[in-house]
Amino acid sequence: MIKKSKTAEVIISALPYIRKFRDKIFVIKYGGAAQTDDNLKLNFARDIVLLHMVGIKIIIIHGGGKKINQTLDLLGVKSEFADGLRITDKKSIEIVEMVLSGAVNKQITALLNQNGAKAIGICGKDANLLEAEVLSGGKYGFVGEIKNVNVNFLKDLLTNDYIPVIAPIAANEKNETFNINADLCASKIASALKADKIVFLSDIDGVLDKNGELISKLNPNLIENLKKDGTISGGMIPKIDACVECIENGVKNAHIINGKIPHSILLELFTDNGIGSMVKEVF
């Protein structure tokens, strides 16, 4: 009886957030362990369906680095990285596109639909969703950045109750294919839509201080200071920079959460304290 009562309390405590978030646009960057562990994948799909059922408009951008590495290794193609980005030559980009758009994207979409969603799997090439240009003058090969987002296409999908699942592959005006960093892709899409929230699923709890403790609330000024003193470093820098870019471009809140925790999205969004790090301009 106590357990049932506790469950009821949890549901009731979520009601204010459900009311607040109805009809809002949330962009979810899906990657890391949450994308490879079968139980976590199922939890993620069910959480997304629940968010959609309570009236939140969801857009998912996914990565697929582990699957890309496995496929490149299988085909005997060497992987190289610089500045945290995959150096992508002409042969590799064909494989990356095949894996992200043809395999990973459709697997995510199918799992969502099996659990009651109305998801549609697309990439940046579809309906000219994303227009790309080469990053850093071609330093990383066929790695691009987003020049333009077809906002009207995304809004049409959301209006018709779809959940877009987007593979970060796009073309430029010459119809050359580019691999886009999924964090940056999610950031550009959220910024273009002026989304209410963007959520990055990571493999750690969020931004940690020098004692390894979670910093639950950050603003751009604090982030700049933490980068200067080395508290924020390494692989967290691209994610936190993406958060700041979103906030500076009209996204109200950015979150970094641990996707290895079951139902982490619900725990972050529907509880008072959350479980990760939230970035906003003013608290």
Curated annotation (Swiss-Prot):
It comes from the Bacteria. It is found in: Cytoplasm. The record marks 29, 239 as: Transition state stabilizer. Belongs to the acetylglutamate kinase family. ArgB subfamily. Catalyzes the ATP-dependent phosphorylation of N-acetyl-L-glutamate. It is an enzyme of class 2 (transferase). This is Acetylglutamate kinase. The keyword Transmembrane does not apply. Substrate binds at residues 64-65, 86, 179. InterPro entries: AceGlu_kinase-like_sf, AcgluKinase_fam, ArgB, Asp/Glu/Uridylate_kinase, Glu/AcGlu_kinase, NAGK-C. GO terms for biological process: arginine biosynthetic process via ornithine; L-arginine biosynthetic process. Keywords: Amino-acid biosynthesis, Arginine biosynthesis, ATP-binding, Cytoplasm, Kinase, Nucleotide-binding, Transferase. It holds the Pfam family AA_kinase. Its main location: cytoplasm. It catalyses: N-acetyl-L-glutamate + ATP = N-acetyl-L-glutamyl 5-phosphate + ADP. One of its GO terms (cellular component) is cytoplasm. One of its GO terms (molecular function) is acetylglutamate kinase activity. It comes from Campylobacter hominis (strain ATCC BAA-381 / DSM 21671 / CCUG 45161 / LMG 19568 / NCTC 13146 / CH001A). Its EC number is 2.7.2.8. Pathway: Amino-acid biosynthesis; L-arginine biosynthesis; N(2)-acetyl-L-ornithine from L-glutamate: step 2/4. The keyword Isomerase does not apply.
